[in-house]
């Protein structure tokens, strides 16, 4: 009888809220609430948001719904209370800010009257050291059969093709045709390049629009899952990886109390991508959002400067990253405790980063290829301050380049595998397997695309080059090996004219070792352009080189399927 009364009460509440004319929060009882407006409504339980009604259709159905979690599915946040913390108007449109409280922090839904969706943001109070942190929707798979990111658009593989006997590794299956593969990692995309992403069908679309990405961890090369098919249930997954780890060596961030992720817009429509694109442009033009009542969020300044190489060239199109104060034990990709900003310099080397939160930052700059493709050094400014309402102009910045003479370079120095065969191709599982066991690259004859993006098989990859001068004993040659990524289970020795000058081996130590070569999952998780960038220098005696024909060989001595080395650039200089 009690259950019947509760169901009847809940049904009557749903009927009542369906007739609501503005944004609302209604408590149902037993840690259950209904939120929404005159366009949509959702029933929020202790952990999961279900019964998402939009245009009189339940968009969740039998799927899991909306939730917030960290460290994968291990920890789904439990909501202990809900309340409206602000009720106001903006541009004469009423809105409410609904706060759901968990032990780890506060999840906010900002709902405007007539809005198709809601703004969301999360404020940390007690998240542990992380790791992965995300918000997401798991939606009805018949309503949302397709996925879209800035780099991929199409039908999500049907659950019927995920055959248990065909599973070969982490969330990866051999397709029923026995030739191709099915994996959620093929739906990866660049985090900071997204305009909008989500899942859609012919009548409904659910999208995330993140115009301000300063709360993301990592730099330009940050890539993450966006959408996919849940392999256990078939749910259509719309994944908001606000602190992702899927392609990194490590991620261990301590978040300050008050760290805010968002706001971003969760947007509902009829499945139209052109409409979502138009909404995305509106949101990007509106950021930072003026309606948000948070002093720290609005305390911002700007950073600008002009980068000039020490040889006089402008640092054209250089990648500029504003991150943690230097020195730091973390790589630029691994930084993620606070707020981070990325941009590119223009042709003259000038750059401006607007709307930077006030605080102290470290500046790092590196080549993004193009006219400075040969620059293998990194410019760093250990600390700079950003003050509210002020422009921090760094003036002219001199970036020291290597004074040595270059004997050869294979590939642009840009932290990516762009230019090589399959380098930067759409995310695709096992594409590295198309690279050969043995390869010979002839400097001056071969093209960049003759080198392949990754080395995964046992064999020799050799660079042959001509040296027109007698070796000078006073000049020590330096071999620079820049890796766009590395997945463990592969070892390589490096030879110059038959003499070992180094190695690329996980965990090795010693004079010729790449100490600390840790693994990232890039190559075996469909990445083709980058994982985590690594840089190594191997110095050796000038007597190893000779006047005339020379060669450098990377000999793969140990391999694991789809693991190995993803190349950025190889440079020999003296």
Regions found by a protein language model. Name each.
Residues 21-83, 93:
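Acidic-aromatic substrate-binding/catalytic surfaces of carbohydrate-active enzymes
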Residues 90, 95-97, 103, 108-574:
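Long luminal/extracellular ectodomains of secretory-pathway precursor proteins
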Residues 4-9, 66-68, 256:
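Hydrophobic transmembrane signal anchors and adjacent membrane-proximal interface regions, especially
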Residues 1-20:
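Fungal secretory targeting signals
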Residues 85-87:
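N-terminal intrinsically disordered, low-complexity, charged/polar
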Residues 19-26, 406-412:
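Boundary/junction segments of secreted and surface-exposed precursor proteins
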């Amino acid at each position: 009888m009690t259950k019947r009364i509760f169901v009847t009460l809940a049904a009557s509440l749903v009927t009542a809220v369906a007739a609501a004319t503005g944004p609302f929060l209604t408590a149902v009882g037993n840690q259950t609430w209904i939120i929404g407006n005159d366009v949509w409504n959702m029933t929020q339980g202790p952990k999961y948001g279900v019964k998402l009604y939009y245009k009189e259709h339940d968009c969740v159905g039998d799927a899991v719904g909306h939730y917030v979690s960290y460290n994968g599915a291990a920890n789904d946040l439990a909501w202990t209370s809900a309340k409206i913390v602000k009720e106001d108007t903006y541009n004469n449109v009423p809105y409410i800010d609904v706060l759901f409280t968990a032990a780890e922090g506060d999840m906010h839904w900002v709902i405007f009257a007539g809005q198709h969706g809601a703004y969301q943001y999360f404020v940390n109070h007690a998240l542990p050291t992380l790791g992965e942190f995300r918000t997401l929707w798991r939606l009805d798979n018949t309503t949302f059969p397709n996925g879209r990111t800035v780099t991929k658009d199409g039908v999500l593989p049907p659950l019927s093709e995920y055959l248990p006997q065909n599973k070969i590794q982490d969330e990866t299956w051999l397709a029923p045709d026995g030739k191709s593969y099915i994996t959620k990692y093929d739906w990866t995309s660049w985090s900071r390049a997204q305009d909008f992403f989500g899942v859609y069908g012919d009548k409904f679309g659910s999208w995330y629009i993140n115009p301000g990405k300063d709360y993301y961890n990592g730099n330009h090369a940050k890539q993450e899952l966006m959408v996919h098919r849940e392999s256990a249930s078939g749910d259509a997954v719309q994944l908001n990886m606000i602190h992702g780890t899927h392609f990194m060596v490590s991620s261990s961030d301590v978040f300050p109390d008050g760290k805010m992720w968002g706001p971003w817009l969760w947007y509902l429509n009829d499945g139209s991508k052109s409409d979502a694109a138009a909404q995305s442009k509106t949101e990007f033009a509106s950021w930072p959002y003026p309606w948000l009542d948070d002093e720290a969020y609005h305390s911002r300044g700007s950073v600008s400067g002009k980068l000039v190489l020490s040889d006089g060239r402008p640092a054209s199109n250089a990648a500029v990253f504003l991150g943690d104060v230097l020195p730091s034990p973390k790589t630029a990709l691994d930084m993620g405790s606070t707020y981070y900003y990325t941009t590119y310099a223009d042709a003259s080397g000038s750059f401006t980063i607007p709307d930077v939160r006030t605080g102290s930052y470290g500046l790092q700059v590196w080549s993004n290829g193009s006219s400075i493709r040969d620059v293998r050094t990194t410019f760093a400014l250990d600390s700079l301050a950003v003050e509210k309402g002020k422009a921090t102009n760094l003036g002219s910045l001199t970036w020291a380049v290597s004074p040595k003479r270059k004997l050869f370079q294979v590939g642009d120095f840009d932290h990516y595998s762009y230019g090589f065969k399959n380098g930067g191709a759409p995310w695709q599982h096992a594409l590295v397997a198309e690279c050969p066991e043995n390869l010979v690259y002839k400097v001056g004859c071969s093209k960049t695309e003759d080198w392949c993006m990754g080395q995964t098989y046992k064999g020799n990859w050799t660079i042959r080059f001509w040296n027109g001068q007698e070796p000078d004993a006073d000049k020590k040659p330096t071999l620079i090996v820049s890796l766009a990524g590395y997945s463990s289970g592969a070892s390589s020795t490096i030879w110059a004219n038959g003499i070992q000058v180094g190695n690329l081996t996980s965990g090795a130590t010693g004079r010729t070792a790449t100490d600390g070569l840790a693994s990232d999952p890039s190559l075996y998780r469909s990445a083709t352009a980058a994982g985590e960038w690594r840089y190594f220098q191997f110095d050796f005696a000038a007597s190893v080189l000779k006047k005339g024909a020379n060669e450098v060989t990377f000999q793969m001595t140990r391999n694991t399927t789809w693991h190995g080395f993803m190349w950025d650039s190889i440079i020999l200089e003296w």
